[in-house]
Amino acid sequence: MAKASVELTRELQDSIRRCLSQGAVLQQHRVKLETKPKKFEDRVLALTSWRLHLFPLKVPAKVESSFNVLEIRAFNTLSQNQILVETERGVVSMRLPSAESVDQVTRHVSSALSKVCPGPGCLIRRGNADTPEGPRDTSPNSETSTSTTHSVCGGFSETYAALCDYNGLHCREEVQWDVDTIYHAEDNREFNLLDFSHLESRDLALMVAALAYNQWFTKLYCKDLRLGSEVLEQVLHTLSKSGSLEELVLDNAGLKTDFVQKLAGVFGENGSCVLHALTLSHNPIEDKGFLSLSQQLLCFPAGLTKLCLAKTAVSPRGLQALGQTFGANPAFASSLRYLDLSKNPGLLATDEANALYSFLAQPNALVHLDLSGTDCAVDLLLGALLHGCCSHLTYLNLARNSCSHRKGREAPPAFKQFFSSAYTLSHVNLSATRLPLEALRALLQGLSLNSHLSDLHLDLSSCELRSAGAQALQEQLGAVTCIGSLDLSDNGFDSDLLTLVPALGKNKSLKHLFLGKNFNVKAKTLEEILHKLVQLIQEEDCSLQSLSVADSRLKLRTSILINALGSNTCLAKVDLSGNGMEDIGAKMLSKALQINSSLRTILWDRNNTSALGFLDIARALESNHTLRFMSFPVSDISQAYRSAPERTEDVWQKIQWCLVRNNHSQTCPQEQAFRLQQGLVTSSAEQMLQRLCGRVQEEVRALRLCPLEPVQDELLYARDLIKDAKNSRALFPSLCELGHVLANDGPVRQRLESVASEVSKAVDKELQVILESMVSLTQELCPVAMRVAEGHNKMLSNVAERVTVPRNFIRGALLEQAGQDIQNKLDEVKLSVVTYLTNSIVDEILQELYHSHKSLARHLTQLRTLSDPPGGAGPGQDPSSRGRGRSHDHEETDDELGTNIDTMAIKKQKRCRKIRPVSAFISGSPQDMESQLGSLGIPPGWFSGLGSSQPTASGSWEGLSELPTHGYKLRHQTQGRPRPPRTTPPGPGRPSVPVPGPRQENGMATRLDEGLEDFFSRRVMDESSSYPRTLRTMRPGPSEPPLPALQKRRRRGLFHFRRPRSFKGDRGPGSPTAGLLLPPPPPPPPTQESPPSPDPPSLGNNSSPCWSPEEESSLLPGFGGARGSSFCRKMGTERLEAGDGAPAPGTAQPPRVHGVALPGLGRTKGWSFDGKREGTDPDQEDSTQAWQKRRSSDDAGPGAWKPPPPPQSSKPSFSAMRRAEATWHIAEESAPNHSCQSPSPASQDGEEEKDGALFPERMVPARNAKEPPIGPRPPKPVAVPRGRRAPQVPGGREEAESSSAAPGANKPWLRLGSQQDQEEPEGQVPSDLGRRTAPLKPKRTRRAQSCDKLEPDRRRPPDPAGVCAGTSEPGTD
């Protein structure tokens, strides 16, 4: 600050400073102010940054007048110490005390003006030419400097402050700080009014006005912000003054027609205007503004490079003027690169569009063309583009237009010609454009002929392609190699996706696929489509990198696709938004993320996900280190936050923390990838290898004594193959370990270490050179300061010690960051190599083992033929049976392993192992999933085999049929419908078709709408479950009376499988009647509407129960389900002769057959065979018994019986369930049918059954061994089926009849399976031959007592009312 005049007192100076507290007082001078001509008065001149103040010589000081430097029109120095200032309000003349004071005032005003209006040269000249000018300081920090090259953002802050002072407004320091700090740090030359939208309109106007004098900013941007009239006036002022503003963006700023007219006038006034990009979209400028702007654009010598006039309410008349301007000004043909006229309906619908078409047909430089929503005729436009835009056009948006304004089915030739001739297209948008089939074919044919394009994004969404379009895509898309991204959303493909999805997979150039809003199909078809999609992304050569099924409303079936993401290695981005998959979908997604290592981006929202679903995702991301981005699910998060705000906030913060962690380079868990790949590679073919090795070993042992040399050579080769097969088990881990050992000190790491050392040396050398150069330059600029230093060398060494780069940092950056990324990629490649080698070797071993097995089996057959006597059949052997046996042996060789070891089947099974099975909460039954997954190569029983805890027979060869070698047979879709009962038994030549019974995966209740969509296409329940079951050997006698007409109609009814409400009771383990089934109640009257009680077949057979063909097909593999007709023929006589004794040793128990609860008919409580609701005790509601109740209530369907599970020693917790579900056995031969009433509580309660129902034998659970024995009770009559002979004991009928008259006929009937027990009489026949009684309760066996000891809580006093007269001991577990 200059020194104040000597005449000014200290008190006056302080008073002036206090008066101008808002601005710092830079100078104070005592002057003579000319108030009248030749009359001067004393005043004080105070100078601030942007204003000159005049004060009288009074205390306290008060401003008499002031003016801003921007008000100065002329500043003249009339004499050595007199100045004349001409302002907007008048002329001010004053004398200063000395020439030095005049010079100080002049330099201050000149510096202020140069900051506001930067420019070269001196702004103030002295009026007297004889007086030489003093020396001017042009240093950057001097007050008289006019250089603005070193000012921040072109001095915007100073200009803005001066304008605020000029207009008398407060200067916003936040504006100055933002510009000087943020804009300067980003080197941003775009002034965005949205950054200051929170300020008032007058403040925005001053910022825009400051741009008129600023040379730093080149772009003014404002979008979606309505600007006031003050701001718009300053925009026009800025455009009229600025010589540096190149781009103006006023998108949706509330502009009117008059503004555009004024803007056109401004362009004409400013000859130095350099504007080349103009955006006025979403403003109603209408035709008047369009015409004015078009006329002014004719005068642009350089034209425009970008013009955006989208949604401006322009008519074809305005477009015609604009097109004529483009054609009249030749500069536009070479300068215009970006043209957007979209969202103007009807703009190109008339003949006025020919002016624009003419411009487009000429050679031009257009790169981006957007004409969406303009009613453009696509065929005419493509004809114009074919001549003028093929060489440069990269973006073409023709959405929401019509293909042609003419009616006709012929494809326009422009489609094929343009798309085959374009050189640089990268984005084509034809969405919501109704393309005829011929146009679509022409488009695809043109792209298939184009060899210049690659990675083209083609948007065909909402084009209503439907079936015809899907067919065209299937035919033409395979030959198109330039499409990298294809959007087929919302095209109504629906069921056509079954064939379209595999066709899309054949295009290996396709990287991004969008299929949303195309799944409006039934549940069964939807699942098939999703499985096709799963098959597509699971292909080894799949090229897809991103997949979108957004807004498809897949709901819970989204999990079918999610389950395939776990082991998927091709997809990096997936969009699952808008599918309503709920929390169960989030849980399935979390399981996939735990093992996936390829996904980088997941988009999911609008899925009804709660905080629990997000919690599952957060837990999954803890073990996922590769997912980088997850879109913020606004809809689901807001909904979850309303219900659980704290949990939702914590979970989302955890998700974000995991994503931030994953975005940093780090080590990927290779051990997890190794274990996952090992399970998928080795376990797929390991079982086949083991079985083949076992069979070949048996054949080698059988042929080891054969003296023939060729046979011995094959045996030696077979032994070598077996050895290789055993070694192949360790092939995968050994190769992985070898790669890991070699990688520790491999050439890559050695090279990285050497590079780190070289980089460290290079960094040191570079720093040395830089420091020496900097010190030398500093010495030249500031030699005195450098001389003060102790010496050049010492300063250099001190600086070098401070700016050195540590070697550990360089080594860590190369080895731990970049090197780790390289190592992760190297590990992925090594794992793929190991997988390929292992698969190749295992496939070769399987083929060779199979060929060896076939050859050795052929030798065995020849030896058996030679060893047979030439006389034919031996004694007691039927020649036909022996021939059948030989043919069966030969069939075993081919049928058990299939016609060949199909490696494709193994690959399909491996692919299926990569897909997680569908959750039981989602799927109705595993059988439905198996039938729908046939095209994927999933063997029958695969899902049930994965979810079953039952062990399979490892020594059985029936499991080899799990690898299918040919397609599935066609099956009638309606054969599962309920049918009326057949009166004629099927002939021996008509085989029974096995029908798998419906089961559920985890016993949970199905949804209410489950099964409604595919009701008429799948079997709801077994036919035999609707009626009382009979043994296979039982046939109703001819004397059986026919059923009533009402009952026949009910049985033939479609909904005969429905149960009455009384079946919904729950039979818990502690129920009073859980272990005792009462005798049948009396027959009902004709008006009773209860269906016949479904009774289970006998379980007392010691060899195998007499299953019906439907029941045999429903068994699990290894438990009789795959034995076939030969096993039934072999076991037929044994079943009839074995009786009801205990099971023979080594005989497998039948497994539990799980049933599926029908919609609305699932049992929430227990039900009994006699149809009576059974209650439960309050003390049964513990966790274990509740789980058993769910299993027992959901595993059995209506009318389904429950065979016992595996032996008690393996699953002791199920003993109570088995005893509760045991049934009675009928032991005696039935006499003529007599309806008997039983004095049971069931009959007293009014429970009734229909006459003529057939009741097989029933079983009663064993009581506790510690209870006192119950004395013999008189036998009670039971209903027995007619036409059935009782099983014969070894003693014959005479022995049985003789024992019937002996005393002690009420002796319990034992079922121990021994010869002694078999010789005992089975029951006492009473004197009344018209009645037959059931046997008494048997003695307790050790195994039954051991079963009781496992559950002591079942012990309770017996119920004498529920004990029948005679019982039969069921087969022990």
From Swiss-Prot:
One of its GO terms (biological process) is regulation of Arp2/3 complex-mediated actin nucleation. Its main location: cytoplasm. SUPFAM superfamilies: RNI-like (SSF52047). Widely expressed, with much higher levels in fetal tissues than in adult ones. Highly expressed in newborn brain. Residues 126-151, 864-902, 970-1373 are annotated as: Disordered. GO terms for cellular component: cytoplasm; glutamatergic synapse; lamellipodium; plasma membrane; postsynapse. LRR repeats lie at residues 242-269, 272-299, 333-358, 390-417, 422-446, 453-475, 480-507, 510-536, 541-564, 568-591. It comes from the Eukaryota. Keywords: Cell membrane, Cytoplasm, Leucine-rich repeat, Membrane, Repeat. Pfam families: Carm_PH, CARMIL_C, LRR_6. Residues 981-997, 1078-1097, 1269-1278 have a biased composition (Pro residues). Residues 1007-1022, 1218-1228, 1345-1358 have a biased composition (Basic and acidic residues). Residues 1232-1243 have a biased composition (Polar residues). Residues 138-151, 1098-1108 have a biased composition (Low complexity). It is found in: Cytoplasm; Cell membrane. Residues 1047-1062 have a biased composition (Basic residues). The C-terminus is necessary for localization to the cell membrane. Belongs to the CARMIL family. This is Capping protein, Arp2/3 and myosin-I linker protein 3.
